[in-house]
């Protein structure tokens, strides 16, 4: 019902009268978003889609007199397309175009506050999921992005032509700093490029951060001297405050570590962008862990798809980002994983619905982020990992290194031999999909460490249906 009062039409109007504009053609400067939307029973999808556009831009639940003080046509979000989700009842893809002026330059925090803010609690919606974002080049150019990127990292490490190898030190909690450093040393001297703090290692009573940093750096320097290779360990600088985080980063730089680590979701995008800018200024690589992501991205009809988080992290800044494995213990659909892996490291990615890429994305030469495959992987997975992720990736074996029956160093050697054998076989034109197991068995004949690993894990599989599929 509308009433005439104070010179404007007060009251409540359908959102679609203002925010549903199917004739609108998006501009190159618009930020585009695709939502998977489940309306409440009886609510038209166009009205729901318009509500999403309104509540994530300029709208509110009623007409307000201050609408007349601005140009709504210039600033409002516009739902320009609604289409049913194939194979799903009462689910729709809703495409919204947002004017560039709605977003602060260089702020991932501001973009997400608008797109995934109050609108996700809207009563007319049973569920809502942000599937993809197209960042316009004009906005991309306001972000620093990764501190260094894949090419610069390879130059700093002097490692080319193969994936990098890593390992998360286990047990994740409870080791003293000296024993932790010893485990790092054994893994690095055995053939790994990196070792890693687990995401929940910060500065607990059993191992304070400064002690860990010093013993780990000793392990790095000792293993480098023995192997004549550049080594590193992802020292987790995540802390309760940004000031403490930067203090730990400064200390890591002072002792000479090449790479540090941050938990970007629990730490927050503002803290992450701050740290990424510090890393570029100080020549330190930045490894990003995605702890908490499954709370946000695992449900198929509500939340945020990981491809959006990966895009946002690339803009916020990170040289590495965990991406799942497809073949390990953690959730990961192959087509969708390959889609967001490309969005992490390629400069230009074409729209491809078969891989979950809803928009063509031009990164305008922003450095790429290296995907990190980790979670329940071992030597038998090596051929599939090399084929799926290619050279510009980091393959991280935690239990698949430390669980070797002969210890950490032989476990690391087994992984390095398996990797080198798979890369050589691929370069010789052999199919890892068909001949991968044979490649590993052949290499195991002259590597007792690999042979022992192959025997130990020959029966281990993680065969569960993927929850989030395309």
Curated annotation (Swiss-Prot):
Short name of any one Pfam family annotated for the protein: RuBisCO_large_N
Cofactors (names): Mg(2+)
Bilayer-crossing regions: none
Residues engaged in binding substrate: 118, 168, 172, 290, 322, 374
Molecular function in Gene Ontology: magnesium ion binding; monooxygenase activity; ribulose-bisphosphate carboxylase activity
Post-translational modification: The disulfide bond which can form in the large chain dimeric partners within the hexadecamer appears to be associated with oxidative stress and protein turnover.
Residue ranges the record marks as coiled coil: none
InterPro entries per UniProt: RuBisCO, RuBisCo_large_chain_AS, RuBisCO_lsu_C, RuBisCO_lsu_C_sf, RuBisCO_lsu_fd_N, RuBisCO_lsu_N_sf, RuBisCO_lsuI
Binding, Mg(2+): 196, 198-199
Catalytic activity: 2 (2R)-3-phosphoglycerate + 2 H(+) = D-ribulose 1,5-bisphosphate + CO2 + H2O; D-ribulose 1,5-bisphosphate + O2 = 2-phosphoglycolate + (2R)-3-phosphoglycerate + 2 H(+)
GO CC annotations, alphabetized: carboxysome
Chief site of localization: other
Top-level lineage group: Bacteria
EC code: 4.1.1.39
Cofactor: binding comment: Binds 1 Mg(2+) ion per subunit.
Modification type N6-carboxylysine: residues: 196
Subcellular location: Carboxysome
GO BP, one annotated term: photorespiration
Family indicated by similarity: Belongs to the RuBisCO large chain family. Type I subfamily.
Extra facts: RuBisCO folding and assembly commences when the nascent large subunit folds with the help of the chaperonin GroEL-GroES. Requires homodimeric RuBisCO chaperone RbcX2 to assemble into RbcL8 octamers, making RbcL8-(RbcX2)8. The exposed C-terminus of RbcL binds in a cleft in RbcX2. RbcX2 is displaced by RbcS; as RbcX2 is removed RbcS mediates the ordering of an internal RbcL loop (Thr-63-Leu-69) in a catalytically active conformation. Interacts with accumulation factor Raf1; dimeric Raf1 acts after chaperonin GroEL-GroES, binding to RbcL(2) leading to an RbcL8-Raf1(8) complex. The basic functional RuBisCO is composed of a large chain homodimer in a 'head-to-tail' conformation. In form I RuBisCO this homodimer is arranged in a barrel-like tetramer with the small subunits forming a tetrameric 'cap' on each end of the 'barrel'.
HAMAP family documented for this protein: RuBisCO_L_type1
Protein name per its UniProtKB record: Ribulose bisphosphate carboxylase large chain
Species the sequence originates in: Picosynechococcus sp. (strain ATCC 27264 / PCC 7002 / PR-6)
Encoding gene (name): cbbL
């Amino acid at each position: 019902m509308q009433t005439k009062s104070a010179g404007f039409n007060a009251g409540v109007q359908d959102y679609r009268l203002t925010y549903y504009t199917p004739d609108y053609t998006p501009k190159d400067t618009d930020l585009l978003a695709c939502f998977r939307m489940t309306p409440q029973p009886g609510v038209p999808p166009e009205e729901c889609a318009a509500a999403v556009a309104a509540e994530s831009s300029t709208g509110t639940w009623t007409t307000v007199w201050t609408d007349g003080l601005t140009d709504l046509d210039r600033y409002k979000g516009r739902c320009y397309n609604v289409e049913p989700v194939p194979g799903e009842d009462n689910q729709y893809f809703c495409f919204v175009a947002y004017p560039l002026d709605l977003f602060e330059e260089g702020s991932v925090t501001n973009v997400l506050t608008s797109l995934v803010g109050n609108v996700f609690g809207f009563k007319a919606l049973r569920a809502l999921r942000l599937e993809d974002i197209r960042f316009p080049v004009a906005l991309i150019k306001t972000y620093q992005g990764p501190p260094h990127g894949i090419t610069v990292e390879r130059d700093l490490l002097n490692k080319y032509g193969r994936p990098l190898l890593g390992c998360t030190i286990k047990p994740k909690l409870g080791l003293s700093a000296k024993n932790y450093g010893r485990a790092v040393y054994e893994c690095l001297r055995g053939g790994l490029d990196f070792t890693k703090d687990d995401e929940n290692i910060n500065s607990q009573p059993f191992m304070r951060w400064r002690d860990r940093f010093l013993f780990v750096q000793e392990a790095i320097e000792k293993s480098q001297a023995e192997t004549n290779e550049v080594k590193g360990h992802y020292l987790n600088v995540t802390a309760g405050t940004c000031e403490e985080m930067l203090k730990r980063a400064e200390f890591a730089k002072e002792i000479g570590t090449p790479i540090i680590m941050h938990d970007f979701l629990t730490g927050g995008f503002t803290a992450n962008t701050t740290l990424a800018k510090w890393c570029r200024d100080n020549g330190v690589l930045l490894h990003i862990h995605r702890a908490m992501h499954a709370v946000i991205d695992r449900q198929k009809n509500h939340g945020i798809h990981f491809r959006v988080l990966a895009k946002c992290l690339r803009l916020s800044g990170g040289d590495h980002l965990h991406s799942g494995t497809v073949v390990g213990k953690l959730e990961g659909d192959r087509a969708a994983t390959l889609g967001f892996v490309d969005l992490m490291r390629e400069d230009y990615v074409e729209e491809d619905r078969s891989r979950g890429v809803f928009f063509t994305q031009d990164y305008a030469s922003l450095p790429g982020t290296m995907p990190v495959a980790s979670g329940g992987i071992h030597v038998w997975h090596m051929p599939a990992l090399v084929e799926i992720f290619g050279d510009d990736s980091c393959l991280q074996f935690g239990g698949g290194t430390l669980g070797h029956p002969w210890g950490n160093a032989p476990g690391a050697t087994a992984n390095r031999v398996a990797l080198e054998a798979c890369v050589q076989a691929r370069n010789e034109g052999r199919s890892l999909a068909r001949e991968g197991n044979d490649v590993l068995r052949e290499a195991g004949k002259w590597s007792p460490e690999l042979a022992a690993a192959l025997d130990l894990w020959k029966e281990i599989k993680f065969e569960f249906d993927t929850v989030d599929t395309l």
